[in-house]
């Protein structure tokens, strides 16, 4: 846990991590292209929890900057994400420019299909708010990511290269 001082009190902030994984019926290179292309593909498999998705600069892979709102657990928050590709073709990250949140998409080949994992890590809140965050955020985000992954699988099946 991370400990920060605030007005002579200590506030403990836990590192939060939420992940979901799903098999996608398409080759890893195709799936990664869908994930990395923020203009032509990625917006088409975002679940309803995401709104107002737009690309501010770039569009495909590293250097792309996106902005969107996400509603989770009754709260809506705006994100401005910068995309990086620590392992191009396999791992793509989105780092929020206004917080510690980092979402990682990992695409691994499995025969003619792929295993896709979405994980988000961030510094959780302290105090009573942090307690509720630790109780509810993982369940809510995991459900959103499971929906996104199912939509990605359906999108990949629908747009299967001929």
List each language-model region with its residue ranges.
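Hydrophobic ligand-binding cavity/cleft-lining segments
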Residues: 2-57, 154, 162
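Intrinsically disordered/low-complexity terminal segments and short unstructured peptides
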Residues: 10, 63-65, 119
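Residue-level detector of alpha-helix boundaries and kinks
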Residues: 16, 27, 68, 92, ...
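Well-ordered beta-strand positions in beta-sheet-rich domains
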Residues: 19-23, 78-80, 102-104, 119
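Beta-strand elements of well-folded, non-transmembrane domains
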Residues: 24, 72-74, 122-126
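Glycine-rich portal/gate segments that line the openings of hydrophobic small-molecule binding cavities
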Residues: 53-102, 110, 115, 147-162
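Beta-strand/loop substructures that line and gate deep hydrophobic ligand-binding cavities in soluble
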Residues: 95-147
């Amino acid at each position: 846990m991370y400990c920060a001082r605030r007005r002579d009190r200590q506030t403990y902030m836990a590192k939060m991590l939420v992940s979901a994984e799903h098999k996608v019926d398409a080759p890893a290179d195709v799936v990664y292209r869908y994930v990395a292309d923020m203009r032509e593909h990625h917006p088409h498999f975002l679940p309803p929890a995401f709104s107002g998705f737009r690309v501010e600069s770039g569009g495909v892979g590293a250097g792309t900057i996106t902005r969107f709102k996400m509603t989770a657990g009754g709260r809506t928050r705006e994100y401005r994400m910068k995309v990086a590709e620590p392992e191009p073709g396999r791992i793509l990250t989105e780092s929020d420019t206004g917080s510690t949140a980092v979402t990682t998409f990992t695409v691994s080949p499995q025969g003619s299909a792929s295993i896709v994992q979405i994980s988000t890590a961030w510094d959780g809140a302290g105090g009573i708010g942090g307690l509720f965050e630790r109780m509810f955020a993982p369940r809510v985000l995991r459900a959103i990511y499971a929906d996104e992954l199912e939509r990605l699988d359906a999108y990949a099946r629908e747009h299967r290269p001929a």
